[in-house]
Amino acid sequence: DSGPTFVVNNDRLGGVDWVFNGWGDHTAFDWSRDANIASEILRMTGAERRPSPLVNEGGGIAVNGKGDVLLTETVQLDPGRNPTASKTSVEQEIHHQLGTERAVWFERGLWRDYQNHGTRGHVDIVAAFVPDGSVLLHRQFDTSHPDSKLWQNQCRALEEAGFKVRALPAPRIARDNIDWVDYSYVNHYVGNGFVLLPAFRDRTDEHALEILKDLYPDRHVTNLDARVLFAMGGGIHCITQQQPLVV
């Protein structure tokens, strides 16, 4: 989340250095040193630094490389992050930095993400673009879970933007020893030749694995127990950043 968002322009590697302020200062931990991680990574990689005045995190955006970006109102418009921002000003800065042209907004993210250690609605646990041009969308089928109410509006927003939506079911595990969980297979990492998918020791793990294998036939898809990461408010995609290979 605190790392740079890598971009490529005319075969030159760059990285957007967003302002990081601890997810709108929504954490009990000291994040002051985390705020310097992006610039340090860019120095180490030799990528061109593109500073941005926008408070944003890696998990707060999802892009398809074709001009589209997914955003969440409770993240980019969070008073603790960007108190004077509007959708228009956010989109202008996002498009300027990433080269995107169109934004699709969700009202909010998953319920647990608003509790302790949460990000207040990161989109990378809700939706992800896949190679065939469709969007994987987290779907909670347990109607007692608060996240079950999100599907209709999020699906409508994507379909109105012209996207085919693929449901990626939530694990059947709905609660841990604290409260409702935000376990999500959407929060996966795509690397060169592989896809790393979260697992939760749930019978839905294998079903999700097969869905991702069908979508990434040219990559080895494997899964890894991610319950500890999710317990602390993160996930596999949350703790990684995609750096494109530029030679």
Report residues per predicted region.
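The feature marks the mature, well-folded catalytic cores of soluble enzymes
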Residues: D1-V247
